[in-house]
């Protein structure tokens, strides 16, 4: 069975708790969109884990997790997160895989993100982690995917500073790289949980544009981020909380301000 968990508001609805609960019955957990700008906080045996890129299912021994094609991967933040898991006794080796079509956040993108937002007449309130710039490069067909890391001709066009940044992570990234659509076909008869990031109102297409994230945070992102057809998504859970909040700028129906 294929089950999707997505935020139905502006994020911070408590998706992590729901994912953690449903992951008990799943063999595989796939995060399908977003990057290090989003995250889930899980408490296990009184210990708090803040996960920004690694799917929450990694906390269950024996579960395999995937970072999908719709994600943008910050290698520095990813391996810091994996080190945190190792330091807390979580054995993740051989259980974390990344789609070869996922794009990579390069150092220059972070600074570009901040400068672009500061230059706007109405700043969006970006996290400054390079997420929007990476998605922009993806749309402009200038991005770097995991699939490109051992493509010599492609990498020859990458700035030396970015090559130097990637060098310490290259071998490990390549060892975690998979064709996720082929993998999903291979495990099609298993229980797979798809973990969303942020929320429907931050979706690039259906959210409160332009005050949105750059990724597909709606349920359709589970299909585009994994290669599974939308008709094969058996259940979709939208997570709400009783009172609405949002981070960053943009409209919110229940907001009070000085003129209210």
Regions found by a protein language model. Give the residues of each.
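Non-transmembrane, aqueous-exposed alpha-helical and coiled segments at domain scale
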Residues: 1-260
